[in-house]
Structure formats: structure tokens, C-alpha cells
């Protein structure tokens, strides 16, 4: 199972090829997400961040893609127009003019309006990501002093 550092490295690789780029095509395996393919196509990727083992892809269209690799999920990055030889099941594809970011075998993918992403059940339970370069002691302090987390242990 991929752990936090592996997800952080995947986010860094994805950021390198996706951030600042417009999506020329979007694919979701899940029927529930198919309607978002047209909505997200043409959106520019603003940021890719991790929250624990979740990866959040923020778009300028006001949506954020939440993905969690679970046990077997794996990201592959290939040049545009290419597809890796694999027996894994493609769950999501984010295409730009130069690259494709392909998520295989993951079972937890959602698209939410960015303003409510923190309401996602997984994200609502966890604190800030310690691997986030933008994390400050003020954010940690605010979280620890919040009603929801007051009097809870850190470890």
C-alpha cells in the first residue's frame, strides 16, 4: 500500500507535468463521474497537494479531484498519445498537450467543488499534511485548538 511519502513523490511528479497546463482531455472509469469529463476538459491545473494518502488536484474551473490510491492504485506519467503496457485497470486520465497522467487500479476518486473539498469524509477526519511545504506551526496550532481536535493525542 502506498504510504504518505510515496503519495507525496507522486504528487511532485504530477505537479511537474500538470501544474499550469490545460487539460485537453479527461477520462473517468466510473459512470458517476463521466459527466465531469466535459466539465473539466479545458480546465487549467492550479495545484496538486497531498493530505495524508489522498491526492487533491485543484483546477481553475472551481473543482478539485480527490483521489486515494487505496491498496493498489498507481500513477503513471507518459508522453501525450502514449499508453503504457500494463494489465492494470485505468480509472482516470488527465491529458495535456505534452503528457498524460494515468491513475490505475484506484477505487476512490471523487470530483467536488473546491470550496467544499474539506467536507469530504476522509479529509474531514485528518489534520494537515506534515509533508506539505506550506504547513506552518500556526496551521497546526489552529487545528489542535479547534473544538473537533481539542484534547486529542498527537500520536
Say what each PLM segment does.
Residues 65-155:
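Phosphate/anion-contacting hairpin/loop surfaces
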Amino acid at each position: 500500500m502506498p504510504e504518505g511519502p510515496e503519495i507525496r513523490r507522486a504528487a511532485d511528479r504530477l505537479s511537474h507535468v500538470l501544474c499550469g497546463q490545460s487539460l485537453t482531455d479527461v477520462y473517468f472509469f466510473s459512470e458517476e463521474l463521466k459527466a465531469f469529463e466535459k466539465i473539466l476538459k479545458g480546465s487549467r491545473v492550479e495545484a496538486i497537494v497531498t493530505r495524508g494518502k489522498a491526492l487533491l488536484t485543484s483546477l481553475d474551473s472551481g473543482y478539485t479531484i480527490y483521489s486515494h490510491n487505496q491498496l493498489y492504485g498507481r500513477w503513471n506519467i507518459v508522453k501525450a498519445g502514449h499508453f503504457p503496457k500494463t494489465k492494470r485497470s485505468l480509472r482516470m486520465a488527465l491529458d495535456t498537450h505534452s503528457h498524460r497522467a494515468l491513475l490505475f487500479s484506484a477505487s476512490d476518486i471523487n470530483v467536488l467543488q473546491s470550496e467544499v473539498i474539506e467536507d469530504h469524509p476522509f479529509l474531514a477526519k485528518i489534520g494537515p499534511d506534515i509533508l506539505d511545504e506550506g504547513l506552518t506551526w500556526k496551521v497546526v496550532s489552529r487545528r489542535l485548538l479547534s473544538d473537533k481536535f481539542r484534547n486529542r493525542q498527537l500520536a
